[in-house]
Amino acid sequence: MARILITSALPYINGIKHLGNLVGSQLPADLYARYNRGRGHEVMFLCATDEHGTPAELAAAKAGKPVADYCAEMHAVQADIAKRFGLSFDHYGRSSSPQNHALTQHFAGKLEEAGLITEVSEKQVYSNADGRFLPDRYIEGTCPNCGFEKARGDQCEECTKQLDPTDLINPRSAISGSTDLEVRETKHLFLRQSAMRDQLDQWIDSKTDWPVLTTSIAKKWLHDGDGLQDRGITRDLDWGIAVKKGDADWPGMEGKVFYVWFDAPIEYIAAAGEWAEAHGKTDADWERWWRTDKGADDVKYVQFMGKDNVPFHTLSFPATLLGSGEPWKMVDHLKSFNYLNYDGGQFSTSQGRGVFMDQALEILPADYWRWWLLSHAPESSDSEFTWENFQQSVNKDLADVLGNFVSRITKFCRSKFGEEVPDGGTWGEQEQTLIEELSTRIGAFERHMEAMEVRKSAQELRAIWVAGNEYLQSAAPWSVFKEDPERAAGQVRLGLNLIRLYAVLSAPFIPDASDRLFAALGTEDRSWPEDVAAALAALPAGHAFTVPEVLFAKITDEQREEWQERFAGGRSA
């Protein structure tokens, strides 16, 4: 039995996430967690809400709530939606937890001891009207390059030119619109990533099985231009983790907090501490997952994220762990995803364009979405959600292939043999051929799942469903029954056992449907089919079952058109 630690990129606290966010991290991480649990491995699957930074403060202000209250409320909302989507976290934590405060301050102290933190004076824009320093992207003005009037202080979205806030013509606060801005000097702490460039380079080179997408992004940041730059790890904000060296104050850093991208990945570790506390466990129970001197040396650690998060997870977070000089578990495999686009454009939170997780569950159960998203995961390139493709995939794969097989075999058995597994008949050449095909395909399915090849895994699972349909079509027990009821009984018994096999293999993708199949079959035998022939005899003659309700309803053209119009844009923020 292996021990597998899985983390998913933390969803930001300011609002409900769309399906593009879901498929880029949490959903494939859940797929991998469920698969490994199904294989009998010990899994720790952690995630949390990312709660610090300017956007959280602004979202709270817009909602008219104290930021701590807003974050607590939105954490509960996101946790509930995650649960309803079947995301099987062992713990869903919060980056604002006491554990993350203590651990972030601990790491900062260790990095300072190692000489990897330096203090830098820099000039930043201060808004007198807002009473705060403004991050670059909260300053708007006219682009000096192309004249676009809503360029941000870090980049013009129109011409893509990189900018500094002082480059903008007629700059104003994006929060209040005020032009009462001034440049003030402020001091911040920087993590000396440049001093660790060679160490990080060697570490990334050792990861020979990482996706090209992941390593190419990391290498670009390491070597392009002037190479890996030092990174500011503090901010002038009220909400966040106070800057300290462990338990001690940090002179000159009073009133400042750690930058959200410094503390957020540390929450992966802190979430394990939260898990231990929530379950009445000891520090040793979570440290065996994260400290290689306390039992984590045999752990396989896998991270899931969108490609925009790769630089922080391949460079900044490893720099924090390696730089601390302590024996923390480093990531073994980093699975990154491209973007999911929406119906000819992009998902847009601000414009309400696309389907958000809460809305998705209002119109269809989670399994419909899980299947489409995972079978179309944006792995080697960006992929696109269209309503036509969604309808086609649900209707063909889920309703026609899997659902139809379950319905046909259970209803036929009920009509000819009653609601129990029939006795009689032996396997012949057709059955042996099916067993050989399934053995080959399940082996391929396992290899794809272990390699985290999400789309290929879904394709192989669908082919396994198709094999059962093709067997049923060629065996034709409804015809055989007229001449040889015994042989038909053997075919039906195999078909009913195929349903159990499908429930086991499909559980990581469509867990609710899988549970319904187990319930209909009256079994909790979820054992993995190491031996396909034995798996197809798991339900013995005389075992009672019930015919399940329709497993997946087809999506009508009218529904598709209605939803396409509804989610074209205009969601109220």
Curated annotation (Swiss-Prot):
Assembly: Monomer.
Keywords: Aminoacyl-tRNA synthetase, ATP-binding, Cytoplasm, Ligase, Metal-binding, Nucleotide-binding, Protein biosynthesis, Zinc
Binding site for ATP: T349
Family in the record: Belongs to the class-I aminoacyl-tRNA synthetase family. MetG type 1 subfamily.
PANTHER family: METHIONINE--TRNA LIGASE, METHIONINE--TRNA LIGASE, CYTOPLASMIC
Annotated protein name in UniProt: Methionine--tRNA ligase
Main location: cytoplasm
